Structure formats: C-alpha cells, structure tokens
Amino acid sequence: MSPDEMKKLAAKAALEHVEPGTIVGTGTGSTVNHFIDLLGTIKGKIEGAVSSSEASTARLKALNIPVYELNAVGEIPLYIDGADESNHYLQLIKGGGGALTREKIIAAASKKFVCIADQSKLVDILGTFPLPVEVIPMARSYVARQIVKLGGEPVYREGFITDNGNQILDTHGLSIMEPAKLEGQLNNIPGVVTNGLFAIYPADVLILGSPEGVKTIYPK
C-alpha cells in the first residue's frame, strides 16, 4: 500500500468526527487535500469550513464548500490537519507546507484537533523532519543566529513566502527531547512569528493509515 493510499484511509476515518451542521477547521497539505475532497461529498450536511491557507481555501471553494473567516465564527468544534511528525504524546512537527502559523491559530481556536497521517509519521523522538520557523523578513539573520545557539542548523527556504508575507527557516539537526520547552524558547526569540512544534497544545487524536487499516491513537 502506497503512502498516498494510507493518507486516504486516514482522511476517510476523520470524516466520522464531523458533526452535522458544524463548521470544520481544515489544515493544509497532501493528507488534508484528501480530507477536503471527502468533505465535498457531505458538504450539504455541514455549515462550512475555516481554512488555514490560500491553497486549502481554493480547494474548498472549488467544491462549493462555504469558507468562513476565523474572526466571523466562535469556537470551532473540529480541526483536521496532517503532520510531518508525531510522537506518542501527539506532539507534532508541522509546517512543511509553510502554513504553520494559521494552522496553529485555528488548532488553538478549535475544541478538538484530529491529526491525520500515514504510519511513517509516528516517531519516538521529534526532529528528523526539519522544524520550520516562520520569521519576519528583517529578523531572519538574527533569528538564525539564535537558533544556532539552541543547537539547530537553520536553512532559509529560498523563494518561499508564507500567506502572511513572512519567511521560513527550516531547522535541521535537532533531537527534540522536550518539545514544549523548545516551542516556547523559539517563540520567545524576537522576530519569530511561530514555529512548527505543536507541543504545548498537542493533537487530541491521531489517525494513522497503515497497510493493516486505520489506527487511532490517543496521547500517552
């Protein structure tokens, strides 16, 4: 079974968490694209969606799913998003697609965060996947120097601008033993908008697609 087929399995299982008449928060990325496509099959049962990126917004609108601004809605019952890595506490690395800031905001504004992924994303220790850090452009070099002091190797994601008009430093070389602590340390660097660790507020449920079927995992 291919990774893409496993992603589809996880996306299909996530549909079971969608309550009729609600607004669904949607993340960004290849796994979420499968979920959005499936959401289109039940669009008459939901009120609409709040999207974490221009790319997801375009996909939702192409399926005629109403898209709301976060400021126009209250607490969102459910947020569905993928991950680049998850540990067994459902602390995540996200942001490979560059939408980490809006993803983190919508996840925080949601009652339940269901993460969907293929089984390869579950790891014992976070950090093999480079950790994205979104930075204000003028602060990029300064932030990079501070990341080096924390033991990371930041690489400027050239030619990429976030939906917020900022830049990304993909940070290599981190073995992240205390994800929540590092998340706070990085976010305290002046010029950092946010980083791709979702550890202070981890996912509530992890749905993994695997050759054996769907695995549902809750935090340790």
Curated annotation (Swiss-Prot):
Cysteine pairs bridged by disulfides in the record: none
Any Pfam family hit: Rib_5-P_isom_A
Residues of the active site: E103 (proton acceptor)
Keywords: Isomerase
Reaction(s) catalysed (UniProt annotation): aldehydo-D-ribose 5-phosphate = D-ribulose 5-phosphate
Binding site for substrate: T28, G29, S30, T31, D81, G82, A83, D84, K94, G95, G96, G97, K121
EC number(s) reported in the record: 5.3.1.6
A molecular function (GO) term: ribose-5-phosphate isomerase activity
Keyword Isomerase attached: yes
Involved pathway(s): Carbohydrate degradation; pentose phosphate pathway; D-ribose 5-phosphate from D-ribulose 5-phosphate (non-oxidative stage): step 1/1
Superkingdom assignment: Bacteria
GO biological process, one term: pentose-phosphate shunt, non-oxidative branch
GO cellular component: cytosol
Record flagged with keyword GTP-binding: no
Family the UniProt entry places it in: Belongs to the ribose 5-phosphate isomerase family.
PANTHER family assigned to the protein according to its UniProt record, in alphabetical order: RIBOSE-5-PHOSPHATE ISOMERASE
Subunit structure comment from the entry: Homodimer.
Function: Catalyzes the reversible conversion of ribose-5-phosphate to ribulose 5-phosphate.
Protein name as annotated: Ribose-5-phosphate isomerase A
Originating species: Nitrosococcus oceani (strain ATCC 19707 / BCRC 17464 / JCM 30415 / NCIMB 11848 / C-107)
Gene coding for it: rpiA
